């Protein structure tokens, strides 16, 4: 997948349906991305790199597109994929996945949570997959975290909406930079009345 020669929102949309795979050394976990958010670097008041901010914790954002930027928020590990050439500091937050298979190990990692609650949030799926900050700064597909763009799915419909948890950021609070597979029950904060059967949210053929 090209993480450099397209806009970050375009990449965030194209990641929906892509298969993400993580191997923790003992178990392999996989799922299809159903929710992403784009962060547009130095101009984006919600981005960690806003105004060119550079601290030790955000250095990975300044690397080439395809780098993993991991950070912890409220004890939750969040995984972002860096986009654009080195120094641009834009990226895509992976907010939720539809598991290829919910395994007993995933349920154990989520302290007994079952069903959609296993992976329907940015800190939930990373815990289910037993991820750690050791991923920060690594290259996608060159270590334990990879994506498969051939075994992917294609959303029947994509919704665009404001990002979650971005208050008091002026126009950036309201920009439609969150992308979701419409109706997929694994999308975070999905109302039950809006949920469809997961298989009905994907195109039957490309």
Swiss-Prot record:
The UniProt entry, under HAMAP family, shows: 3MGH
Per the record, the similarity remark reads: Belongs to the DNA glycosylase MPG family.
> What organism is this sequence from?
Staphylococcus carnosus (strain TM300)
EC main class here is: hydrolase
Which keywords fit this entry according to its UniProt record?
A: DNA damage, DNA repair, Hydrolase
Has the keyword Heme been applied to this entry? Answer: no
Q: Give one GO term, molecular function aspect.
A: alkylbase DNA N-glycosylase activity
Q: What is this protein called?
A: Putative 3-methyladenine DNA glycosylase
- Gene3D superfamilies reported for this sequence: Methylpurine-DNA glycosylase (MPG)
Q: Does the keyword Ribonucleoprotein apply?
A: no
Enzyme Commission no = 3.2.2.-
- Biological processes annotated in GO: base-excision repair
């Amino acid at each position: 997948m090209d993480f450099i020669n397209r806009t970050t929102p375009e990449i965030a949309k194209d990641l929906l349906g892509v298969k993400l795979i993580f191997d923790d050394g003992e178990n392999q976990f996989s799922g299809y991305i159903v929710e992403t958010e784009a962060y547009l670097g130095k101009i984006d008041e919600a981005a960690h790199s806003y105004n060119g901010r550079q601290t030790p914790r955000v250095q990975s954002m300044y690397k080439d597109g395809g780098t993993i930027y991991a950070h912890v928020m409220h004890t939750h590990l969040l995984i972002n994929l860096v986009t654009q050439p080195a120094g641009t500091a834009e990226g895509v937050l992976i907010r939720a996945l539809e598991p290829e298979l919910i395994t007993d190990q995933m349920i154990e990692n989520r302290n007994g949570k079952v069903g959609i609650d296993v992976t329907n949030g940015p800190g939930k799926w990373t815990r289910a997959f037993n991820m750690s900050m050791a991923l920060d700064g690594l290259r996608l597909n060159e270590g334990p975290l990879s994506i498969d763009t051939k075994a992917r799915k294609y959303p029947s419909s994509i919704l665009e909406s404001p990002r979650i948890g971005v208050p008091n950021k002026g126009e950036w609070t309201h920009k439609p930079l969150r992308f979701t597979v419409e109706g997929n029950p694994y999308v975070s904060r999905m109302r039950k009345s809006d949920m469809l059967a997961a298989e009905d949210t994907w195109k039957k053929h490309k």
